[in-house]
Amino acid sequence: MEVPEDVKRRLTLPFEENFFAGHTACQGCGASLGLRYVLKAYGRKTILVIPACCSTIIAGPWPYSALNANLFHTAFETTGAVISGIEAALKALGYKVKGEDGIMVVGWAGDGGTADIGLQALSGFLERGHDALYIMYDNEAYMNTGIQRSSSTPYGAWTTNTPGGKRHFLEKRHKKKVIDIVIAHRIPYAATASVAYPEDFLRKLKKAQKIPGPSFIQLFAPCPTGWRAPTDKTIEIARLAVQTAYFPLFEYENGKYKINMPNPKKEPKPIEEFLKLQGRFKYMTKEDIEVLQKWVLEEWERLKKLAEVFG
């Protein structure tokens, strides 16, 4: 597609669109933004594997699809196994996988289908060393089935099975560190990314394409519906998650950590700035907020030390 010169000068993302209008995502959906960026990075030479999740519905009902790519729907827990099988089959048939001119096999699964139900298959994919990319789009609950908590749901959050109010059954466990579990497999490349920083996400997608072996990206993707947030605040919320160090951006490449924060020398903003835009946190007490703030800063300090020692 020919890009006008005046447009080209302003572009920081690829011009070509492979995620079309007519999809069924909710307004402000962070996952649909992320999927759009993936297809901008890799184009039509992509095989997407999507399990049961919001994105299964977003793509559209058969025989229609909003995705201009090869698409394989699979069972909830099997993303890691299916991308492993597709990669092995492509190689057996003589196709090049990964690299600039290779086919990109991409698993695209939510936090429930990754951190919980699909964790075993993810581990197998990583351990076997397949040339594919697994992306966990993290909206911090089982949104497609009715906003139930997952192990990626943060401390203090309301969900339909951790309700707030008088009985105060809010989530009392901290968010599972899936990226740490992945890094424990000592794969060549793993990273965190956010829909609020698309240039950073695109750069990491391109790096995952070039590096042989399994790659993993944990993508922060707000869900206004499940987070009880205004639909026009998706990017602001995602940006605040990074600026408060609740969801720091970093890379792990061949044993080395590198922090990718937009303002690395700036102190994190108070966690309240992230929380106050979301109705799911409205039942948190002052003590709850202090607990979450303490955890966020402890994890941020731990990451900085990892980057200092293994950078």
Swiss-Prot record:
GO biological process, one term: sulfur compound biosynthetic process
Stored Pfam families: TPP_enzyme_C (PF02775)
EC number(s) from the headed UniProt entry: 1.2.7.7
Superkingdom as given in the UniProt entry: Archaea
Reaction catalysed by this enzyme: 3-methyl-2-oxobutanoate + 2 oxidized [2Fe-2S]-[ferredoxin] + CoA = 2-methylpropanoyl-CoA + 2 reduced [2Fe-2S]-[ferredoxin] + CO2 + H(+)
Broadest EC class assigned to this enzyme: oxidoreductase
Cited Gene3D superfamilies: 3.40.50.970
InterPro entries given in the database record: PorB-like (IPR051479), THDP-binding (IPR029061), TPP_enzyme_TPP-bd (IPR011766)
Annotated TM spans: none
Record bears the keyword Oxidoreductase: yes
GO MF term list: 3-methyl-2-oxobutanoate dehydrogenase (ferredoxin) activity; thiamine pyrophosphate binding
This protein's UniProt keywords: Oxidoreductase
Quaternary data: Heterotetramer of one alpha, one beta, one delta and one gamma chain.
Name assigned to this protein: Ketoisovalerate oxidoreductase subunit VorB
Organism of provenance: Pyrococcus abyssi (strain GE5 / Orsay)
